[in-house]
Amino acid sequence: IVCFVAVFMFMNKHVTYIGYKDAGITIIEDNKDEVTYRTNIKGNYRWRTSLDRETGVMTIHFEQSLWEKYVSCIFYPYDHIHDILKKDEIKEVYVDKDGTTTTIWEAPEEEQKAYLSEEHTEPLG
């Protein structure tokens, strides 16, 4: 039992940052309200986001523990789908571990101007 607990703790503590290239992000739908994209990450994972409401730029990155990669996906498989609500942001950027950024999606210039001309105090979503 002690060995199992030790393995479980190790697999949960060892977290790997997933680079943009390894995430395999593909946009699968872009309509008037939202953009939907899929990742090709094996197993489950978690993500961290930060939205600058003034600029409309959302930053995101994915990370994964060994438990999420090899074990938890058996019990709780993810669909690996993410949505961008266009009313909440005008650009979504992936940030790699070294700080390199890659644009996942960016609104057309006229939508950016409209977003930036409004005050964004309402709740997200």
Model-identified regions with their sequence ranges:
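Polar, acidic low-complexity tracts enriched in Ser/Thr/Gln/Glu with frequent Gly/Pro and Thr-Pro motifs
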Residues: 20, 28-125
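Hydrophobic membrane-insertion alpha-helices, especially the h-region
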Residues: 1-10
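Ser/Thr/Pro/Gly-rich low-complexity linker/stalk segments immediately outside membranes or between
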Residues: 10-27
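Short secondary-structure boundary micro-motifs
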Residues: 9-11, 34-35
